[in-house]
Amino acid sequence: MLTPVYEEQFHDHSYGFRPNRCAQQAIITALDRMNDGYDWIVDIDLEKFFDTVNHDKLMTLMGKTIKDGEVISIIRKFPASGIKEDDEYRESVIGTRQGGNLSPLLANIMRNELDKEMEQRGLNFVRYADDCINMVGSEMSAKRVMRNITRFIEEKLGLKVNTTKSKVDK
């Protein structure tokens, strides 16, 4: 029910966990951009994405598309997996179940905000799940993209960039 609604909104350069899309298509798109002269790579990896998704931010994003309050209420229960510590259960306001049926869609809804931001900035990018690469023409541009997109991810989406795995390279 939700997938067709959101598929219309998802960016063409988003390939992870989507119908009729695969990693090979993402690689082909990236190679095409590199062959066009965009040979500096900004490789951005999100740190522990499923553990750090803010439920309120996600529900706000979903509320822009889904207007039925009952549907939102049902969906809100899904990511609130809670935490069990010392034999005591408490609700969690961040994170979503990794491996759950709805998790990939919820993840793409959140990460679609990143896709829209990169498109608005005119970037050549490919995203597969929580890995994103931007292809640019110079080292200076690559460093600027890394800095600005990292700031967007952390300040606007409330997510964390994995600085160990993320890099600028040619």
What do these predicted ranges mean?
Residues M1-P4, F17:
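Accessory, often N-terminal, substrate/partner-engagement and coupling regions
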Residues Q9-R21, Q25-K170:
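Conserved polymerase palm-domain catalytic core
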